[in-house]
């Protein structure tokens, strides 16, 4: 943004440098080049699915060819049923196929298309994207109502939580695993997740766009119009996951509620109803805004990984989401809070995976 003060340019440069410094060429089981989450620890020298989608969306702005290859690297290991596995390494024996990750890949592909107008890449990816999109409804919709659940191929809750990307989120504390019909490797948590279905709604919208570009017919399921009302608790004024057994809301207010705003699934009235919670300094408008769970929650832990700290991707979803609904002044204020208050962000410190919400 040209209206930002020059002191914030360093943050933008740091973000680009962070991506470039984590760039790794193809080697061994990594058949295409891409970005690793961190070169500082050996166990992070691999490619993770939802990291790849976000890295590629960012790379699209300055190195779209690298962005394409990073996506191709994950699809090199697409399973026969369409699944994209969690993570891949130079040694394929280390790959994790117990779970997938949240589906943001069509968003990444669309970002690449926005900056390149490369219809050939859309044509290359479309069949694979459709196979992955359909996989969610084939293997992760326990009661076949069009609302999906996170799950695993081995029936473990551990891998199912990994599939959400939010490994130890409070909303999963009481979750149980259910075997899905039709395949031995299809298991779901006993709760439908709002973020997953909001992501799928965006994937659906973009896949329809790609189909239009290619002149083909979109033949996937479409439940996108149902997501907002299904997951919105009118009494609490917030989005929550829902239990499969009785449809009740899992009223653990967390960052998954930002996703319907970012994906533009929420209605304007729903976003307005959320504002009291989002702007409450005891809940989500913390010193560093938009934690992974409301800061006054009894289980909130400032060092609890997905049980308290802010993660920059989720904070971005919240701020971008507010902007999507016209709350530009509020979004600007929260953006500056992030830039000004994260220790070392404007100075020489590295960008961290997550941060505490308070001073």
Where in the sequence are the language-model features?
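Aromatic-rich carbohydrate-recognition surfaces in CAZymes
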Residues: 45-169, 197, 250, 309-331, ...
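Short, intrinsically disordered, charge-balanced linker/junction segments flanking boundaries
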Residues: 198, 211-215, 359
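Extended glycan-interaction surfaces of carbohydrate-active proteins
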Residues: 3-46, 69-95, 145-192, 225-310, ...
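Extended, well-ordered alpha-helical scaffold segments
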Residues: 7-14, 63-76, 119-137, 203, ...
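Hydrophobic residues within well-ordered, non-membrane alpha-helices that form the packing/core
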Residues: 19, 59, 109, 204, ...
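Proline-rich low-complexity regions
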Residues: 103, 127, 218-219, 260, ...
């Amino acid at each position: 943004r040209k209206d930002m003060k020059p002191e914030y340019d360093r943050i933008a440069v740091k973000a680009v440098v962070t991506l470039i410094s984590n760039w790794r060429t193809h080697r061994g089981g990594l058949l295409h080049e891409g970005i690793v989450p961190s070169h500082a620890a050996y166990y992070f020298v691999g490619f993770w699915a939802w990291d790849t989608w976000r890295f590629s969306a960012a790379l699209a702005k300055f190195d779209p060819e690298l962005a394409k290859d990073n996506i191709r690297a994950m699809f090199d290991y697409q399973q026969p049923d369409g699944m994209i596995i969690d993570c891949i390494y130079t040694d394929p024996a280390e790959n994790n196929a117990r779970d997938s990750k949240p589906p943001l890949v069509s968003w990444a592909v669309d970002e690449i298309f926005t900056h390149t107008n490369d219809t050939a890449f859309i044509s290359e990816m479309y069949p694979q994207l459709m196979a992955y999109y359909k996989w969610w409804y084939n293997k992760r919709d326990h009661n076949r109502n069009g609302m999906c659940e996170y799950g695993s191929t081995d029936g473990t809750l551990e891998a199912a939580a990994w599939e959400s990307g939010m490994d130890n989120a409070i909303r999963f504390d009481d979750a149980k695993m259910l075997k899905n019909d039709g395949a031995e490797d299809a298991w779901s948590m006993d709760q439908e997740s709002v973020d997953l279905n909001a992501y799928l709604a965006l994937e659906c919208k973009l896949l329809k766009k790609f189909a239009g570009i290619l002149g083909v017919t979109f033949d996937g399921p479409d439940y996108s119009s149902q997501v907002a009302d299904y997951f919105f608790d009118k009494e609490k004024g917030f989005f929550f996951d829902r239990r499969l057994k009785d449809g009740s809301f899992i009223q653990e207010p967390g960052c998954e509620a930002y996703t319907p705003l970012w994906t533009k699934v929420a209605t304007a009235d729903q976003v307005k109803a959320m504002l009291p919670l989002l702007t409450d300094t005891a809940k989500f408008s913390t010193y560093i805004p938009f934690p992974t769970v409301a800061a006054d929650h009894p289980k909130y832990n400032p060092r609890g990984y997905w049980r308290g700290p802010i993660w920059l991707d989720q904070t971005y979803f919240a701020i971008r989401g507010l902007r999507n609904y016209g709350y530009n002044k509020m979004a600007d204020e929260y953006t500056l809070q992030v830039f000004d208050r994260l220790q070392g962000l404007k100075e020489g410190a590295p960008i961290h995976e997550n941060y505490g919400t308070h001073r």
